[in-house]
């Protein structure tokens, strides 16, 4: 049997039965669990973008931007009329263009606490032909549902396992620490590790800018038994270091690292880091994506698009 590449290993959700109401059972072969069907890794016709957002609540990015700039988040939700992530035709146009650019699969990094609409992802995949992987998880402490603070890590893990068994979920992510990692975020990371053990779903993370807590995230996950080869530590392109010391430390342990905000002004400063990692022998550990999240990034609006 053909040996899978590291990228295919990360993409494969190997632990769940496809049916929504059937109990979880091991899959006999590696699969990619998309929102519509399970597919074999070798059938993906193009690159996989491991961290995009195709469905978010209208108020998510205004809240995110306010918190990132140290301001109070908006008091009321943004009206949904005309919101681009609720425009099926517009998003299908974008996904069709992304397919033509050579992308063969997209992993959506949203989940309920970010306003992800799973039904929309299914309709988007069906209309555009783009295989889409949906995720489960809890983003970062400023966005956690209130109950997460009081729940035990076992309760959080059980909830993630429930989501993965009842819905077509193919990954756990994006799981984040907002700035310095908090005790509650540590609890969520431990729960994610336990959910991974029960589901085999790969994990991808959000690190606070510029890449804070990257090593700590992998430490927590590995301590509860998550193999580093099943983890992608995200937003490492924001950690600008020509010596790529943190990047190499993560790769040496077997983890993937994400350069996942591509398509903007910061790309040029990341090229030397990518070249340094390739020269160090870590090309197979590198994952790329755009973290699509705003209308300005769409091709129709003059942006680079997901591809």
Question: Predicted regions span which residues?
Answer:
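N-terminal secretory signal peptides and thylakoid transit peptides that target proteins
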Residues: 1-17
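C-terminal segment of N-terminal export signals and the immediately downstream linker at the start
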Residues: 20-42
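Alpha-helical scaffold segments that flank or form the walls of functional sites
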Residues: 41, 45, 50, 55, ...
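Divalent metal-coordination and catalytic microenvironments
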Residues: 51, 106, 196, 257, ...
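Active-site glycine- and acidic-residue-rich loops that bind
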Residues: 112, 237-241, 260-274
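Distinct, well-ordered alpha-helical segments
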Residues: 119-122, 147, 182-187, 210-225, ...
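Active-site gating/metal-coordination segments in enzymes
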Residues: 123-127, 131-202, 253-256, 262-264
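Short acidic/histidine-rich active-site segments
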Residues: 206, 260-261, 283-303
